[in-house]
Amino acid sequence: LVALVIYSVVMAFLLPRVLAGTTAIIPLGVTEFGEVTGPVPLVPGSSNITQSIYMIGNLLCFLLVAAAAMQPDGFRAVVVGMLAYATFSIVFALVDLATYATGTADLLGFMRNAKYTLHNDTEVSGLKRIVGSFTETSVFARSTLGVLGFTATLWLCGWRGRWSGLLALASIVLLVLSTSSTAIVGLPVMAVVLYVSSLQIAFQKVSSTAWLFGVIAPVFVLVLALGILLDPQVSGVVRSYLDTTVFNKLDTDSGVERSSWNTLALQNFIQSWGLGVGVGTTRASSFLMALLSSVGVIGLVLYGLFLYSVYLRPRGVARSFESDVRMAARNAAAGLLVGDLLLAPSIDQGLFFYALAGLAAAVPVRHAFGTPHSAGPGRAA
């Protein structure tokens, strides 16, 4: 991660100047052409600075969380903090729905102060587009996919079962009702991730929750699918909802615009000979396109090594509280990454993602006379 951040910051200042005018970009920030939404020649912009600062901030977040989690008490505190974040995220979503239904949405105006137009009072198929504490429905959905990955995995492992299970269930309901294409596409992906994790948990440790989920989940999905298919009215509603939120999305003005961003981002990658045009220079609508267009092949390799070293490389004691939390952090990061691949305009993945990475990377130091396994924050009865 350190190498990725250093490379990103250096290239953010170097590449837009060295490659100036060699390709057309959709500026992420303000350039010498002002605030524009269409293609302009490659030039440095304000977001080269702001995105570099965000990258440095993400690195500091990762290091601070990893350092705090190196102690058993700190590790447990970070886990509780993650659950608190999940709780507040869901509470804000419920408040968003409640204030909209009662005509008191202005009460949330103190945190909806962005300069651009916010679509936080629109409906799709009769459902309010949920934004919670975020600026857009898609951003809310992306964060909630991460919350689902973390809380559902802890529930499968039996840690804080009532709290984590309730949060996971609430996340699923809110994602379905959010009307976000990110949520509708991301939910099946997370279902597969969580099902594979349940099988892994069931074979590694004694967990009745994981065993029951592994047996019941496929049956539930089959019964639900048959119920929808056999009821013409219900299947019509579901089909209409999917058409509106997913299948017809690319034909909307927003879908066409976002597709053009990705097309131009890929062109930036090719015309820069695989180097990219610098972090914060151009706008995309997919994390992969943003990564390629910003930091090129070298950045892609560094990011892949970061993911492997943090989320995939074995560390610590197997079948322990820490290993369960690492799996939860990995699944949460998978949820966030799914959302990023569908909508991210830049390579900044935010503090939530890098806090999860810090938690996954930490191996708490055992005291000389301590027990070999952490007791964790408590199992559900």
Regions found by a protein language model. Give the residues of each.
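Alpha-helical transmembrane segments of multi-pass inner-membrane proteins
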Residues: 52-64, 77-110, 117-197, 313
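Loop-to-helix entry and N-terminal half of a specific, functionally important transmembrane alpha helix
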Residues: 315-343, 349, 353, 357-358
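A membrane-periplasm/extracellular boundary helix in multi-pass inner-membrane enzymes
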Residues: 6, 13, 91, 96-104, ...
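Transmembrane signal-anchor hairpin modules in multi-pass inner-membrane enzymes, especially those
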Residues: 1-32, 308, 319-324, 362-381
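Membrane-interface helix-loop-helix junctions at transmembrane boundaries of multi-pass membrane enzymes
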Residues: 1, 154-166, 311-330
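Membrane-interfacial entry segments at the cytosolic side of transmembrane helices
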Residues: 73-82, 159-165, 203-219
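TM-adjacent membrane-interface loops and short helices in multi-pass inner/ER membrane proteins
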Residues: 11, 240-291, 295-302
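Transmembrane alpha-helical segments and their membrane-water interfaces
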Residues: 1-3, 11, 27-93
